[in-house]
Amino acid sequence: MSGTYDDSVGVEVSSDSFWEVGNYKRTVKRIDDGHRLCNDLMNCIHERARIEKVYAQQLTEWAKRWKQLVERGPQYGTVEKAWHNLMTEAEKVSELHLEVKNALMNEDFEKIKNWQKEAFHKQMMGGFKETKEADDGFRKAQKPWAKKLKEVEAAKKSYHAACKEEKLATSRETNSKADPAMNPEQLKKLQDKVEKSKQDSQKTKEKYEKSLKDLDGTTPQYMENMEQVFEQCQQFEDKRLSFFREVLLEVEKHLDLSNVESYASIYRELEYAIKSADAMEDLKWFRNNHGPGMSMNWPQFEDWSADLNRTLSRREKKKPTDGVTLTGISQSGEQSSIQNQHSSHLSVQSAQSTNNPFEDEEETVSINETENKKIENVGSYEKTHPAEWSDDESNNPFNPSDTNGDNNPFDEDALTTLEVRVRALYDYDGQELDELSFKAGEELTKIEDEDEQGWCKGRLEGGQVGLYPANYVESVQ
């Protein structure tokens, strides 16, 4: 991100105001935060799309299983037809949720990804071009004023020191007059010292006043230049805020599938909440709390006070707030250099990858001959025994784990490739049953190439096969 401004070294900060030396960095950091927020929003949509896919699969499996049970059961007539319509409804809802999943990934996710790529341009040395341009603009605008401010601080310090010395010399002269042992020569030296200290005080005072006047003369131009760079940053943030609002409204439209009043009211409230977002209001808040709208304790002439043993520095009056350090993924020792080069980007990416896993290989589910026999047995059993509901999948004869993938409407062609040895760059804990877990530095075998969602299939040393994020490993040389 932004570097430390050289000319600000030694300048004491008296407040948290935007106008203080170096306090523009919060505005520069907001640009980097915008890139991270794009990743956060993409992962949020990614995870919701996965939920939609899993729910659609469960509805299809449920409808297929219960169609067979009702057909072979004792129910008949219009009630049987009505019962069948319940499964037909599930199939249609399943299709709708698959459409939602596709819309979220193919439209909303891709739209954010493309906008982020167009808005932020990475540099070879790390960071983003937009961040560096803003930082350079602020530093250039602040450099002349910061230099004058350092001169004011130095002049004030010299003046206050001279005043203190004058006070001490005057006190010694007064005490010496009351001392009968003090000879005229010594008294004359003290008087000369008092006179010299008064002259020094006057000179340093004049220099202090002159440097302060020079600073006041450069302040209007300083404010104008800083305001100009800040407005450029505001325009960039305005585009991001407006884009996020637009994307959120599109996501809301894709999610709103229900005509039931209770669901409709939820989506009305969601739409109202999103449409209540106002980019201009956000920009106004940032301006008043972190920008030119903040109050400023402009430097003024401060006379020396005899009651003070020392002068409070600008830093002692109010220390600036410490920055916030983002922490991310753990890594092996041999990858520390890579992490240092890309710490800002990787810390965000890794945290999001861990918390928002998503894979698009479809789980295959169908009913084989063995399950058909189970269905027949259950159907005949339920004709003579009352049914008892249980959520325990281990006792469910129609558990999806007993099925194969011959007739699964969600099945996709698997990607094949030669087996390649890879090494984990970071720790990863699988979030689903079909995902692998490993530690940084651990080696495994990649058995399928990366899919369109960024996942690979691999095999651990113990033989376990599953999915893992492609950017969590590197090829073993």
Curated annotation (Swiss-Prot):
Residues 163-176, 186-216, 370-388 have a biased composition (Basic and acidic residues). Residues 25-274 form a coiled coil. GO terms for molecular function: phosphatidic acid binding; phospholipid binding. Phosphorylated. CDD domains: F-BAR_PACSIN2, SH3_PACSIN1-2. Ubiquitously expressed with higher expression in the ectoderm, the neuroectoderm, and dorsal mesoderm layers. This is Protein kinase C and casein kinase substrate in neurons protein 2. The gene is pacsin2.
